[in-house]
């Protein structure tokens, strides 16, 4: 019997598998396909990402440095409002490579990471969980037993449903695609032209340029995306689509199952990004969850919320600005634009002494 079976080997799942294995637990991590595929997420992250990967992987993963963002209330021809820092705000990285690097870290720590394993069902018992999985290229199913199961299988989590846990508050429909021309620009472009969210353009160095957006269900994201790329006069390829969970549910644990990452809605409400929040929650889980102690799941539940709830709550407030009337948005952007002292993962840093000093100057 395993101490933990981890379902899904994205950033949150790989991080937890690594940390739990480093603690000495027997960990099995199952990925339904190939780690990192298909791509369904941007690779624009804060520089904190380098705290989670080996130093020798940085050169391979790194694509571009970002120092600021141009905000628009219209298309690229509209007036731009530049928000910037003199130091790097964020980096653009190889998103598929990140997943594979984190999975390799879990393997080196001692976790058994298996690709091509799709979990088809679980059954909780007082002292363990039965897990059933299909294996690519094989008939029938394979059974595993674990003391605890970590559901890290994304926004449309099969494990969450099987465990009877509630859904995230909202799921946006995100799309992105790429052009191939090199672009080493040091700022991203953000367009407040999408209902209740935004569209973006991210220069990825030699890897090309990423165009994307997210919108609530019911909005025609394809038409919105075509409008974005038409405004820039580009044709894209490698089109990707996926759900973006916004708002964690009231609980992400049962007696022997817990959720991490997108499956738990552990994302930034104002950007939809969840890589750092998911790995932060994974560290909380690894610190507090003990496979022989169902009560420790309650400690994890409290710990991750205490760590992230303020940022998630403030992120919701920022997102409300996306729905303000355009004239109000223009005034707000004009007043706030310039040098900033805000951390892109921590909206509470808007009230930091550093940011307020720069804002007032």
Predicted features and spans:
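Conserved acidic residues
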Residues: 3, 145-147, 256
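Glycine-rich FAD pyrophosphate-binding loop
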Residues: 5-9, 15-41
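Conserved phosphate-binding and hydrolysis motifs of nucleotide-dependent enzymes
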Residues: 8-13, 147, 261
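N-terminal FAD cofactor-binding segment of flavoenzymes
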Residues: 32-75
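Conserved N-terminal helical subregion
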Residues: 58, 64-65, 70-162, 172
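FAD/FMN-dependent oxidoreductases across multiple families
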Residues: 121, 217-292
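Conserved FAD-binding catalytic core of PHBH/FMO-like flavoproteins
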Residues: 156-222
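C-terminal helical "tail/cap" subdomain of flavin- and related membrane-associated enzymes
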Residues: 290-361
């Amino acid at each position: 019997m395993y101490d933990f079976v981890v379902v899904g080997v994205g950033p949150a799942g790989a991080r937890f598998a690594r940390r739990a294995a480093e603690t000495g637990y027997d960990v099995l991590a199952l990925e339904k396909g190939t780690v990192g595929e298909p791509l369904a997420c941007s690779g624009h992250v804060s520089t904190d990402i380098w705290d989670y990967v080996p130093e020798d992987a940085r050169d391979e993963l790194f694509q571009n440095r970002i120092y600021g963002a141009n905000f628009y209330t219209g298309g690229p021809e509209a007036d731009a409002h530049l928000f910037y820092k003199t130091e790097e705000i964020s980096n653009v990285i190889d998103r598929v490579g990140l997943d594979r690097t984190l999975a390799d870290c879990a393997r080196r720590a001692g976790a058994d990471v298996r690709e091509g394993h799709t979990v088809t069902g679980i059954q909780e018992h007082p002292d363990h969980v039965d897990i059933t999985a299909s294996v690519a290229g094989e008939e029938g199913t394979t059974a595993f037993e674990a003391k605890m199961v970590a559901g890290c299988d994304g926004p449309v989590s099969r494990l969450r449903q099987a465990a009877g846990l509630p859904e995230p508050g909202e799921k946006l429909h995100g799309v992105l695609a790429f052009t191939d021309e090199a672009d080493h620009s040091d700022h991203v472009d953000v367009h407040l032209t999408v209902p209740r969210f935004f569209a973006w353009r991210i220069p990825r160095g030699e890897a090309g340029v990423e165009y994307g957006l997210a919108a609530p269900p019911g909005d025609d994201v394809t038409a919105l995306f075509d409008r974005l790329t038409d405004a820039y006069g580009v044709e894209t390829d490698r089109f990707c689509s996926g759900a973006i969970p916004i708002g964690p549910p009231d609980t992400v644990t049962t007696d022997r199952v817990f959720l991490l990452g997108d499956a738990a809605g552990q994302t930034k409400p104002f950007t939809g990004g969840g890589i750092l929040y998911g790995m932060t929650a994974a560290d909380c889980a690894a610190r507090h969850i003990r496979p022989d102690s169902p009560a420790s799941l309650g400690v994890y539940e409290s710990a991750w919320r205490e760590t992230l709830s303020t940022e998630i709550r403030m992120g919701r407030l920022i997102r409300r600005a996306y729905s303000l009337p355009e004239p109000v948005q223009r005034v707000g952007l004009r007043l706030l634009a310039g040098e900033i002292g805000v951390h892109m993962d921590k909206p509470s840093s808007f009230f930091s002494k550093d940011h307020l000093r720069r804002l007032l100057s």
